[in-house]
Amino acid sequence: MRLELLVVLLVGLAALAPSGSTCCKTEPPRCETEPPRCETEPPRCETEPPRCETEPPRCETTTPKCETTPPTCRTEPPTCKTEPPTCRTEPPTCKTKPPTCRTEPPTCRTEPPTCKTKPPTCKTEPPTCKTEPPTCRTEPPTCKTEPPTCRTEPPTCKTEPPTCKTEPPTCKTEPPCEKHCTKRIKRHRTKRTKRSKSTKKIVHHHNRPGTTPESGCGCGSKNESGGGGSGCILKDLLTPKCPDSKPKPQASPKCKSDPKPKAASKTTSKPKPKACDSGKKNTTKKPRKTQPQKGGC
């Protein structure tokens, strides 16, 4: 762009010059100036990272080998021979216990060997281990056994006649008036019966031996005062009566479930056994509805 402007200025100056002057043909200078070619290549900075190869120092420290042999201390066991004591005692006329001869055991004291080994001093390259020889001192055992002294005094036998005082025992055993044996019988559960009414508690009453229902200890229920009501007639007929029977003090009545009153309650009519029933039954139970029979009956 600058070269073109210079050429235009030179042409303009030549045109303005006076034409009547000498004929000087001045050709315009040809300035062929090529623009400089600046080829600047980017610098190639190839810097390799420094390779620092530092080997770790090899520190080889050999451990000193200190071989210390353990001291061999042999202590022979003491041989203490003690003859058994000969105690001869004449057999006495009375039976006496055999004499007790106490022989004290021999006291053999063996002191433990004192083996003192100093710790080895190991110096590097080469190790010098100095171990002093062990000094084992074993004193001979001193066994002192005194002869046993057996003293047997003549036995004194005193036998007094035994005094046996045996008083006749006073046995006062009154059997209880009445015992109730409870036994649970599971009913067959149906849709109508509830879970709480599936088990029925049956109370069995037992008479005192030798008593009758009239005396007050009958087969009445817990709620009844004296028992022996009209419902006990069937029970008295079923239980066997012993003529002129007296109460035995040593035997108490046992509670066993008698199957006879249960069988009698099924065969008898409904209003009679209600007197002997326990008071725990639900009296407000609604009667079941009887379905009408099909047919003319």
Curated annotation (Swiss-Prot):
Mark out the compositionally biased spans (Basic residues). 181-208, 282-291
Q: Which GO terms describe its cellular component?
A: extracellular region
Q: Where are the sequence repeats?
A: 26-32, 33-39, 40-46, 47-53, 54-60, 61-67, 68-74, 75-81, 82-88, 89-95, 96-102, 103-109, 110-116, 117-123, 124-130, 131-137, 138-144, 145-151, 152-158, 159-165, 166-172, 173-179
Question: Where would you find this protein in the cell?
Answer: Secreted
Residue stretches of biased makeup (Basic and acidic residues)? 27-58
Q: Residue span of the signal peptide, if any? A: 1-21
Tissues/organs with expression: Salivary gland.
Q: Which UniProt keywords apply?
A: Repeat, Secreted, Signal
Annotated effect of mutating residue 275 to V: In strain: Oregon-R
Q: Which GO BP terms apply?
A: puparial adhesion
Q: Where is the composition biased (Low complexity)?
A: 59-84, 141-174
Renumbered residue ranges of the record's region 22 X 7 AA approximate tandem repeats of T-[ETK]-[PT]-P-[RKT]-C-[ERK]:
26-179
UniProt-reported outcome of changing residue 267 to A: In strain: Berkeley, Oregon-R and Oregon-R(2/10)
Report residue spans for region: Disordered: 26-84, 141-218, 243-297
Q: Does the keyword Repeat belong to this entry?
A: yes
The Gene Ontology terms for molecular function here are: bioadhesive activity
Would you tell me the protein name for this molecule? Salivary glue protein Sgs-4
